UniProtKB/Swiss-Prot annotation:
InterPro entries in the cross-refs: Group_II_Decarboxylase, PyrdxlP-dep_de-COase, PyrdxlP-dep_Trfase, PyrdxlP-dep_Trfase_major, PyrdxlP-dep_Trfase_small, Pyridoxal-P_BS
Biological classification of the source: Eukaryota, Viridiplantae, Streptophyta, Embryophyta, Tracheophyta
Keyword vocabulary terms for this entry: Decarboxylase, Lyase, Pyridoxal phosphate
Organism: Solanum lycopersicum (Tomato)
GO MF terms held by the record: histidine decarboxylase activity; pyridoxal phosphate binding
Tissue-specific expression: Ripe fruits; not detected in leaves and unripe fruit.
Keyword Protease appears in the UniProt entry: no
GO biological process: carboxylic acid metabolic process
Family from the record: Belongs to the group II decarboxylase family.
EC number of this enzyme: 4.1.1.22
PANTHER family xref list: HISTIDINE DECARBOXYLASE, PTHR46101
Protein name: Histidine decarboxylase
Residues reported to bind substrate: H129
Positions where N6-(pyridoxal phosphate)lysine occurs in the chain: K242
């Protein structure tokens, strides 16, 4: 596709370029299974007329805006919805709609470091999102990287060991509610208990929960542990464009109002501002508000259940075929052996790490899509990659432990 910028391009040529681009996107959408994006938002076309305006939610969502071209009322409605979901009263929380999960993480650690525990050490598992380590570098925080269990969950013994060694320093802790690659969920209650066992008082630690992917799944699943502000956590961030679905990248950050104590009053925008960004997208609050209003708790619960069931369905199919595979409880991320062919990986938009690949089962990924992927995978495995009896699938014992199905499986036990 020719998309270089030329002077005075005709409308006909522009339309031709965009039409070709749209056709490519529509075709590739069928194969987008490796990254957590919900593309089921055709109904958002209803909101297209808004694009004739510029909407900017600059500054604090809860303060007056100097112009009419904003969507702060919608933003506050979305924030109130999440505050209720995460069990914190309206007058006790503060938050805003971010550009994505990364900004939410940056804001959470900014609060933990700048406002509360300036000498605190940051504790994060090695399977945490890269933005956690970016925050440590940006804020020049002392980072304690914690080992992980084979399923990607934080290693609680290693955490305890490092907490005890650094007991003279406050702790700022990242909790993963769905790690980037394995979809692992850290046990918040166990981490809190570990802090208490190590002698940390409530005012000597700050917990940020990175719920980028699973934040809208766990609340609607029976027997899943609650992540709530009724527990001693400081902030929660979530991605809006992942499980919920939004055409533009966005996220939600919620914290305790008492933590946002030194807001900067900016005369130019007539607003206090404790956000990371200056100008903020005024469209994303409306898209999120619209989607939450259309779906409600019932549809979100159904989406959550369906995705978990479909993830188990894919796991079972791979397992029956003798393929190394792992799926965490309450997760929609299916980890399996990395395909040999880069073209296959590219065709199905798979995310890969070392000898592993994963599929993230989002709303819109149907069993028909899963069956199509599985059929394609088996065709490649049986007639191309491993047709030669000497060619063997990789051993994933180091990454998947007993979930590895390679020829050396007996040696793993």
């Amino acid at each position: 596709m020719e998309s270089d910028i030329k002077n005075e391009t005709s409308f006909q040529e522009l339309d031709m370029i965009l039409t070709q681009y749209l056709e490519t996107l529509s075709e590739r959408k069928k194969y987008h299974i490796g990254y957590p994006i919900n593309m089921c938002y055709e109904h958002h076309a209803t909101l297209a007329p808004l694009l004739q305006f510029h909407l900017n939610n600059c500054g604090d969502p809860f303060t007056q805006h100097p112009t009419d071209f904003h969507s702060k009322d919608f933003e506050v409605a979305v924030l109130d919805w999440f505050a209720q979901l995460w069990e914190i009263e309206k007058d006790e929380y503060w938050g805003y709609i971010t550009s994505g999960g990364t900004e939410g993480n940056l804001h959470g650690f900014w609060l933990g470091r700048r406002e509360l525990l300036p000498n605190g050490y940051l504790y994060a598992s090695k399977d945490s999102h890269y933005s956690i380590f970016k925050a440590a570098r940006m804020y020049r925080m002392e980072l304690q990287t914690i080992n992980t269990l084979v399923n990607g969950e934080i290693d609680y013994e290693d955490l305890q060991s490092k907490l005890l060694v650094n007991k003279n320093k406050p702790a700022i802790i990242n909790i993963n509610i769905g790690t980037t690659f394995k979809g692992a969920i850290d046990d918040l209650d166990f981490v809190i208990q570990t802090l208490e066992n190590c002698g940390y008082s409530n005012d000597n630690y700050y917990i940020h929960c990175d719920r980028a992917l699973c934040g809208l799944i766990l609340p609607f699943i029976k027997h899943a542990k609650k992540i709530t502000f009724k527990k001693p956590i400081g902030s929660i961030s979530i991605s809006g464009h992942k499980f919920l679905g939004c055409p533009m990248s966005c996220g939600v950050q919620i914290t305790r109002r008492s933590y946002v104590s030194t807001l900067s009053k900016i005369e130019y925008i007539n607003s206090a501002d404790a956000t990371i960004s200056g100008s903020r997208n005024g469209f994303t609050p409306i898209f999120l508000w619209y989607c939450l209003s259309k779906k409600g708790h019932a549809r979100l619960q159904q989406d959550s259940i369906t995705c978990i069931e479909n993830a188990r369905y894919l796991k079972d199919r791979l397992l029956e075929a003798g393929i190394s595979v792992m799926l965490n409880d309450f997760s929609i991320t299916v980890v399996f052996e990395r395909p040999c062919d880069h073209k296959f990986i590219r065709r199905w938009n798979l995310c890969c790490l070392r000898g592993m690949a994963h599929v993230v089962i989002m709303p819109g990924i149907t069993r028909e899509t899963i069956d199509s992927f599985f059929k394609d995978l088996m065709q490649e495995r049986n007639y191309k990659w491993y047709q030669d009896v000497k060619a063997l699938p990789p051993c994933l014992a180091d990454d998947l432990a007993l979930n590895c199905m390679c020829s050396n499986k007996k040696m793993h036990n």
